[in-house]
């Protein structure tokens, strides 16, 4: 019974995840929905089996995204506004949220980074960045979007994928780590 319940949930889970990612990266990050959809599909295990059956629609006026899977699953994500991001709309009432006023603080960039993108200062670091952005195996792409390397409180190297820059907000899930 447990496996049947999980199999039954696959369409809703897949469409919900994709709807939320496409919504967030379209309306928060400002990226192209077609790129987001393709890159998301390429890194999700098992989606190659269902990608042909998935469809998405972005409504830039209403600021929402709908993803369907052959009519078996349909999910709708809505952008709530600056600082609130996107949420999955399950059809129920939506709580009215007001954010507290943001405290205006100057950016720390002048203290931790230079005036321009920090190029790696060693061949080893440059090679590591090259490897991180290389797409050696097209069947399992990395889709690396940004890497910022800090040492002793200062940015010592950074690199961004095409269409991504210093000011591009990106969702990070749990991939942002420090060693």
Predicted features by range, described:
Residues 2-49, 54, 62-67:
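N-terminal low-complexity, Ser/Thr- and acidic-residue-enriched intrinsically disordered segments
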Residues 7, 11, 15, 141, ...:
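Conserved aromatic-histidine-acidic binding/catalytic patches
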Residues 18, 22, 124-127, 174, ...:
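Extracytoplasmic/secreted proteins, especially bacterial periplasmic and envelope-associated proteins
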Residues 27, 94-128:
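Short, compositionally biased leader-like segments
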Residues 45-94:
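N-terminal accessory interaction module
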Residues 113-150:
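Beta-lactamase-like hydrolase cores
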Residues 147-155, 169-179:
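Active-site SXXK
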Residues 157, 161-165:
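A short acidic/small-residue loop/turn micro-motif
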